[in-house]
Amino acid sequence: MDRRYLFLLASTRRDGNSEQLARRAAAQLPAGTSTTWLRLDEHPLPPFVDLRHSSGYGDPEGTARELAEATVAATDLVIVSPVYWYSLPAAAKLYFDHWSAWMRSPALKLRERMAGKRLWVVLVDSDQAHEGSAAPVLDSLRRTADFMDMTLAGALVGHGSKPGEALQDAAVAAAADTFFRSGPA
């Protein structure tokens, strides 16, 4: 089966540290590997409203449909994000909130279609490596993968604030070069 990677860029900063790290890692994928890069700020979702116990959900429409279809079409979902206040940026959190609706869409069947797929995480925080500010994000995404019967295939964490700082760390740059060859996190 051909692999199809969906890179979801959660930063509002173009060419920021997390994107640079992800692009370096993606450059090492085998030639011909399908990659799709979507910026969540260019695909804004409406506010999420929990309708589980009232009217229920219809099929996603507009931008939500585009993101949902790209998500289920991928074999590998790559979340590319800075760490904001020990969490994902709002656009990424909103994307995952919408999964609650997409799981209940009879046409989409998100949970069934995501089972067995791989979730990859590329994060950059502004702390030092030993401070662990990315840990809450990684825990949340690990739990998401478990709930969806996905495999958390790898987590690449860099540290930096100004664009380019994360790749100045030789160990992080080297990890990016082999990231998609790693086993489950």
Question: Where is each model-derived feature located?
Answer:
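N-terminal beta1-alpha1-beta2 submodule of the flavodoxin-like/Rossmannoid cofactor-binding fold
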Residues: M1-R104, A170-A185
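Short histidine/acidic/glycine/proline-rich micro-motifs that form metal-
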Residues: T12-D15, V83-Y86, S126-H130, S161-G164
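Residue-level signal for alpha-helical context at structural boundaries
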Residues: R23, T36, L110-R113, V137, ...
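Short, solvent-exposed coil/turn elements at secondary-structure transition points
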Residues: D41-H43, D125, G158-S161
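Short, basic/glycine-rich phosphate-binding loops at helix/coil junctions
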Residues: P44-V49, W120-V121, L156-V157
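Short, glycine-/small-residue-rich phosphate/pyrophosphate-handling segment
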Residues: L108-A153
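Glycine-rich phosphate/pyrophosphate-binding loop and the adjoining helix
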Residues: A135, D139-A185
